[in-house]
């Protein structure tokens, strides 16, 4: 895992500043490439191999190619088979990737699977392409205005260029107030964008001409004739590739529990982490209790990280600032506290496994049950009548035959608190989802369609952005095996509507597969708290004071958002105002960090 940076041109000192701003992503080594058209930079977090073999940008004297790469590729065995015998003893994915580039040129992308953000430059063509992986696990940002083009793994890398236009993207602000984050390609800045999953940007460095397109990553046949249980074991074995120890975030839920089981099956040393919340309602530590019990049953070395109210408040501003984008998730400070304990300044882990991504493959969220129930109701009455009933009850104007409307109905955060009222517009979402749906939306099952919506809008737009920024701030690579694209495609083809949900709960197929392997207290549990901080219990005057201190400087702008109204919501309530307030707190933190008006 690393940080990649670059820009068109040869401005002295700029790449060094970009590398410096993103050094936390790769503290082991920094490198630079420059020719008359482009400057590229790289920060290395060494995971697989000795330092010298891992350094980037990758070049060869006789080759026109220059590579900067952030991520991990897991199909290294298949990559070796496509290269000559000189690569037979190579384990480093970067070396294998460069070998494929030399063999296949721009078509290399058809032969790799993993999580990645890639910058590839051809010196002879003066052409740059930047790529984001199909699941969106690795963010990649770019700035495009006039003859200027800059890209980086993080927004702060782009803002290292002092002249960058910081004009605000009002549409992105609207999305943040509707959803609590910004899905798709938008950021708070009009001229800074992020690549979407499966998107490639092509840049003619001589004429500064940009084209964008989507590539289809076809992983059919990846697992051959393997049965589902074999696929899980193979998946985890591939994701354990590392010269460093690999630990696991163990939540007590199905997804992380099955990862622990598969780690034990391949004989991997098991180190697990979970959170315990100080002085909170018993229900908030139910998951911690189960995780502790499961770790003991499997003989894992288990660490509990205690989250106190003081720690939460002390890390509040830093955690939301680290994400660089607005975020409504109330557990953001908890994630940072956890990453600090696990990472470079704590236990010095470099690789952590996470169960993220399983809910969007095996229908884990409660709203999937509701989607199926609504579909049954729509069959009983005509769609217009159904829409009328639901809209009258909720004061909205949705057409539930559209996946975007149905998704927004369940996923919307709160009515936006803006200076001027704005109505929901389906086009805001469909412009993001349609390219993705054209490649992967082959099944019409409403639960599957709901999972696709979550994959492209929420998982890539919120979850992976948050987890990447938080963990990389502590020089830790977070891997999410259950979001692996070949794994997704295998189960998307295998499962149907009847496999997702049963009367006893969601994840029907997964629970049945692991019954008899995992303990019943995991496979048969009907409730899961999730890693949610107990703010309703903790909230007091110290929270209110902090929240108001963050909002107060924003009152003088009042340009897009009604900050006065938000302040009143905090002032007038003795209880926690709700998760929507965290979206506005994060917007205020970022506005002050970036010196912009909202």
For each of these PLM feature ranges, what is it?
Residues 86-92, 167-170, 328, 441-454, ...:
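Structural motif
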Residues 501-523:
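Charge-dense polyanion-binding interfaces
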Residues 77, 488-492:
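Short, solvent-exposed hinge/capping segments at secondary-structure junctions
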Residues 292-476, 522, 526, 548-551:
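Glycine-rich active-site loop/lid subdomains used to bind and stabilize high-energy intermediates
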Residues 1-323, 350, 516, 564, ...:
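Cysteine-centered catalytic environments shared across enzyme families
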Residues 518-574, 578:
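PAPS-dependent sulfotransferase catalytic core
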Residues 98-102, 172-182, 454-461, 579-595:
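Short, hydrophobic/amphipathic alpha-helical patches that form generic packing surfaces
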